[in-house]
């Protein structure tokens, strides 16, 4: 899977990757609660960027946002990743035992 020009070895069909994704999503939820308490725009941007960065580290083991300071770019990267994961999930769910001959 390509993320921000980096090849990342992630497949949601692989048990360890699925578990890492679930952990990353749970951790992200906790961080969102902390971010909501922030008062300044710069703190919100900084902490939200860090949340997305940590999400990728937790989910894939790769720091794909290491040099990213643009919140919009971080959000787009996250959204792209989720689309890719969704496509992988659809392939898994399309499987049917009746397809085996």
Model-based region annotation:
Residues 15-101:
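Short, surface-exposed, charged amphipathic helix/loop patches that serve as local interaction elements
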């Amino acid at each position: 899977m390509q993320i921000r020009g980096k090849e990342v070895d992630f497949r949601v069909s692989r048990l360890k990757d699925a578990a890492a994704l679930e952990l990353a999503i749970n951790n992200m939820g906790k961080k969102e609660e902390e971010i909501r308490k922030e008062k300044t725009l710069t703190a919100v941007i900084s902490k939200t960027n860090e949340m997305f960065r940590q999400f990728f580290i937790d989910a894939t083991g790769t720091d794909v946002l290491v040099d990213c300071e643009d919140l919009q770019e971080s959000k787009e990267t996250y959204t792209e990743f989720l689309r890719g994961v969704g496509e992988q999930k659809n392939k898994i769910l399309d499987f049917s035992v009746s397809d085996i001959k």
